[in-house]
């Protein structure tokens, strides 16, 4: 080439870096956000707009944030930012859950239990200090994720004002008649030394003893007569029960049978040389006898369970205790024997049966529940023969009780069972049901259950199955145990009568007075309060309750203590948490909201799945498959983590591995490279001077703006329904297909070779400006750091931050009367695909190198040919080939053929043209390039 024409080309130029270098670049952006008070500015720009309120469920203030925390906070942040772009004012007030056992345990490890080195006041102060330290650590990590919010004024359940508002919320619930006191079996953790809520329980596999125990009939002949059978004088009769909790047998006070179940009187194994008949559910008889070593089913009679009611049995090892046969609808024929040993102090259904029969008052508290808070039998527990139970832990007692039953001849079968069993979520140890005096929010007393079920149907659930799940939970849940026997928490400030145990008749009013004091001095004031100040002459008749509130009550009333307190409306638009919160925060918030206001505190509930590795396994240190968010940020950047979260179907388990992160990084690179190319081609473009009206744009440029408009509508709708994976998929497809494989490739010729101010070049730049201005908004909620950086390179005057704007309004659909309609482009792009397919074998066989070396002939039906012939001169630019000829033919549709060109290659544009060499000034250039270099410039209309 005799002359260097590179200087006559307008190649891309931008300072926007090719490499994201996110771990280094993101902290600088964060510093600027902090310095400029970005969140306050965002709220100021949104002032006066409609409000969208996403209420933050508080994480627990203990330990570093993990991947699940990151997923939750980033999903919320994506929604908050998208709502700002959608024209809403979307405040975000983060919060922390600060009371409860994990913090108590942390302080106990350092200082010992209350009373060892610290009194209760000092202990609570250490808990408060510890929680504040943990909040600082977590707040730093949450901000590093790119999550914006009111981090300088979060809500904390340990704040005096919050604790006071929590007591006021409880007073409302008392006013509405939902609070009750009772001695009921509740989930109990021996390590906590306290009752547990449903949400504090997790199910883990456990191996338990499985025993069948015979309860002899006290009047065997009468019981046999129920089955229309005559009992021979030398035959014994017993009712076997099956249990996996032998330790509860000392508390066994009855046997329950199913009233409508069919029972049979069968021949059982001999006992002490005598025959013994057994009563078994007919559906379970053969299976039970097989456990007892009996192969043959010999039936002596049959009867319904209801016929056995009130017949009396003997306890298997307490001869003085009589055991009535009672009817219980909970008894099934699924497993066991069809007879259930009933210990009302250790089972909720057992307790209900005794309640129905009015039997609870016949027994002392120690008979109902012979186990103390640590899991040890009380000193009053009678021995089992020579086995002393008093002072023995129940888990140690299990095998000893089995041995004692065997010695007494009442053990019919014994084995081990591996099954799912409830454990304490904090200690990971097995829990039990244990009857203790507790405070409850009743599900029935003031019709809370039915009101909550109705409220659920007025909420929109994402995914939809969330509604059925929480409906089932509310339908079947017991009363909510809200009292805890611990130190660090909000007290239940009730005065109860010293003799009757009844709460003071002015309890709600007194609680509000106490709340006013707590707001000024904290919860310690309750414990130091001289009750004569509030009760006057009644003070001697009452005593204070020392229980504290369940931490799920703390977080469950944030709609009252945070939203109302900060002047925000109820219900919130959205609650968003992990799928486990159907039985946690969603449920506690629902119950308190309905109890106080007869309405759910949220309009929508969205749940996300848990994080797992690529094999679907839960991430854990023991498996070595855990990936911490801090490590991802340190090596790849927060935007990569945000992109993975957004691109994953969070309604199910969310898989993450190094390979998945690599694919996510590749996707990020595609987005970054696309935007960098757009910015590079906007070099020298000023939208105030060079923007071309949509109606004057080249047809292809107008079409890509149309495509961007369609995509923006799809993206906006997907943000509205929280489908972020669709957004990422659509954006990546747009980058690869519409832009990378088509538009950016086709427009290079115009952008590089035309005059700087040529209408065709400015048209392409205008389209690219519109694309970039829209694109940066599309990604801003997800790739917040990258969007912030990209925005700073966007030409022209604009707001300081992309989130101070709304969705881009410079896009528009193609009008129906456009010179080339959207339907026309669909056909042309189909034709382009056919051209590509025709050229592939030519390239593979060496007939051509680049597509520019091929000349194309399109034979089409008359109507199609007539539509395409005006475009003939410019179709080569759309196809990026040599000359294109369109001819009418007697065919349906069209047919494409190609041949290698014999023309010379232009040294500047690389097109093969017939007029190269015809111009002595520039013998190496085609006529088009000559007019672009020295002349008025070429004219384009279509491509």
From Swiss-Prot:
EC number(s): the record gives 6.1.1.5
For this protein, the record's Gene3D superfamilies field holds: 1.10.730.20, HUPs (3.40.50.620), Valyl/Leucyl/Isoleucyl-tRNA synthetase, editing domain (3.90.740.10)
Query: Which cofactors, if any, are listed as required?
Result: Zn(2+)
Keywords from the UniProt entry: Aminoacyl-tRNA synthetase, ATP-binding, Cytoplasm, Ligase, Metal-binding, Nucleotide-binding, Protein biosynthesis, Zinc
GO MF entry, a single one = aminoacyl-tRNA deacylase activity
Motif 'HIGH' region covers: 59-69
Q: Where in the cell is it found?
A: Cytoplasm
Q: Can you state the subunit structure given in the record?
A: Monomer.
What this protein is called in its record is Isoleucine--tRNA ligase
**Organism listed in the record:** Xylella fastidiosa (strain M12)
Q: What is the lineage of its organism?
A: Bacteria, Pseudomonadati, Pseudomonadota, Gammaproteobacteria, Lysobacterales
């Amino acid at each position: 080439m005799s002359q260097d024409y590179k200087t006559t080309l307008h190649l891309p130029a931008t300072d926007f870096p090719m490499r994201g270098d996110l771990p280094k670049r993101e902290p600088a952006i964060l510093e600027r956000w902090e310095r400029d008070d970005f969140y306050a500015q965002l709220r100021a720009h949104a002032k006066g707009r409609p409000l969208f309120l996403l209420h933050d469920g508080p994480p627990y203030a203990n330990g570093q944030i993990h991947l699940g925390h990151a997923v939750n906070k980033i999903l919320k942040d994506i929604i908050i930012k998208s709502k700002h772009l959608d024209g809403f004012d979307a405040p975000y007030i983060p919060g922390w859950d600060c009371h409860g056992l994990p913090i108590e345990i942390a302080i106990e490890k350092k200082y010992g239990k209350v009373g060892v080195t610290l009194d209760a006041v000092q202990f609570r102060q250490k808990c408060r200090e510890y929680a504040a330290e943990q909040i600082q650590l977590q707040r730093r990590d949450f901000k590093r994720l790119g999550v914006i919010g009111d981090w300088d004024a979060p809500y904390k359940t340990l704040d005096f004002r919050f604790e006071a508002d929590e007591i006021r919320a409880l007073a409302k619930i008392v006013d509405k008649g939902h609070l009750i006191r009772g001695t009921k079996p509740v989930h109990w953790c021996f390590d906590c030394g306290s009752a547990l809520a449903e949400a504090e329980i997790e199910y883990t596999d456990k191996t338990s003893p499985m025993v069948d125990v015979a309860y002899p009939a006290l009047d065997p002949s009468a019981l046999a007569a129920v089955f229309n059978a005559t009992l021979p004088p030398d035959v014994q009769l017993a009712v076997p029960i099956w249990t996996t909790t032998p330790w509860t047998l000392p508390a066994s006070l009855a046997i329950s049978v199913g009233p409508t179940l069919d029972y049979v009187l069968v021949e059982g194994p001999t006992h002490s040389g005598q025959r013994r008949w057994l009563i078994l559910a007919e559906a379970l008889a053969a299976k039970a006898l097989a456990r007892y070593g009996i192969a043959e089913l010999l039936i002596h009679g049959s009867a319904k369970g209801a016929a056995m009611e009130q017949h009396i049995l003997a306890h298997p090892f307490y001869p003085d205790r009589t055991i009535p046969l009672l009817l219980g609808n909970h008894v099934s024929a699924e497993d066991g024997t069809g007879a259930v040993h009933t210990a009302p102090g250790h089972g909720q259904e057992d307790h209900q049966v005794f309640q129905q029969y009015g039997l609870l008052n016949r027994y002392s508290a120690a008979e109902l529940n012979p186990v103390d808070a640590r899991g040890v039998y009380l000193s009053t527990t009678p021995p089992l023969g020579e086995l002393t139970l008093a002072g023995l832990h129940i888990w140690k007692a299990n095998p000893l009780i089995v041995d004692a039953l065997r010695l007494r001849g009442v053990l019919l079968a014994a084995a081990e069972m591996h099954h799912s069993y409830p454990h304490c979520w904090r200690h990971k140890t097995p829990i039990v049901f244990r009857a203790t005096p507790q405070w409850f929010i009743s599900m029935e007393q003031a019709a809370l259950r039915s009101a909550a079920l109705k409220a659920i149907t007025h909420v929109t659930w994402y995914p939809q199955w969330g509604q059925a799940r929480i409906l089932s939970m509310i339908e079947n849940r017991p009363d909510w145990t809200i009292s805890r026997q611990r130190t660090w928490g909000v007290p239940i400030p009730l005065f109860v009568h010293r003799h009757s145990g009844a709460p003071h008749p002015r309890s709600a009013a007194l609680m509000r007075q106490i709340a006013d004091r707590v707001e000024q001095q904290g919860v310690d004031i309750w414990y130091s309060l001289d009750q004569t100040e509030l009760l006057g002459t009644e003070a001697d008749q009452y005593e204070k309750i020392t229980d504290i509130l369940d931490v799920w009550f703390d977080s469950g009333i944030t709609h009252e203590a945070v939203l109302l307190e900060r002047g925000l409306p109820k219900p919130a638009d959205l609650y968003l948490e992990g799928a486990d919160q159907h039985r946690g925060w969603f449920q506690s918030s629902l119950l308190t909201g309905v109890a106080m206001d007869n309405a759910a505190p949220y309009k929508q509930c969205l749940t996300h799945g848990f994080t797992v590795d690529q094999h679907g396994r839960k991430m854990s240190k023991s498996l070595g498959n855990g990936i911490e968010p801090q490590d991802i940020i340190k090596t790849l950047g927060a935007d990569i983590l945000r992109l993975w979260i957004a691109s994953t179907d969070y309604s199910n388990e969310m898989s993450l591995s190094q390979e998945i992160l690599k694919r996510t990084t590749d996707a990020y690179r595609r987005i970054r490279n696309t935007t960098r190319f757009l910015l590079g081609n906007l070099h020298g473009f000023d939208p105030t001077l060079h923007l071309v009206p949509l109606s004057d744009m080249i047809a292809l440029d107008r079409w890509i703006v149309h495509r961007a408009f369609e995509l923006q509508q799809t993206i906006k709708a997907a943000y509205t329904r929280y489908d972020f994976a669709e957004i990422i998929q659509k954006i990546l497809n747009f980058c690869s297909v519409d832009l990378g494989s088509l538009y950016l490739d086709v427009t290079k010729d115009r952008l590089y070779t035309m005059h700087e101010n040529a209408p065709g070049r400015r048209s392409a730049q205008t389209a690219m400006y519109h694309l970039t201005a829209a694109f940066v908004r599309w990604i801003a909620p997800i790739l917040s750091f990258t969007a912030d950086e990209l925005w700073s390179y966007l030409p022209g005057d604009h707001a300081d931050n992309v989130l101070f704007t709304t969705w881009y309004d410079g896009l528009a659909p193609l009008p129906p009367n456009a010179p080339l309609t959207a339907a026309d482009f669909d056909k042309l792009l189909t034709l382009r695909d056919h051209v590509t397919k025709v050229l592939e074998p030519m390239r593979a066989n060496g007939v051509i190198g680049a597509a520019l070396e091929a000349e194309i002939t399109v034979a089409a039906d008359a109507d199609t040919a007539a539509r395409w012939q005006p475009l003939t001169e410019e179709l080569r630019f759309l196809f990026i080939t040599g000359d294109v000829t369109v001819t009418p033919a007697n065919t349906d549709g069209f047919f494409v053929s190609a041949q290698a060109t014999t023309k010379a290659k232009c040294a500047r544009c690389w097109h093969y043209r017939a007029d190269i060499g015809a111009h002595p000034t520039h013998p190496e250039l085609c006529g088009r390039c000559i007019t672009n270099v020295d002349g008025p410039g070429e004219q384009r209309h279509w491509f």
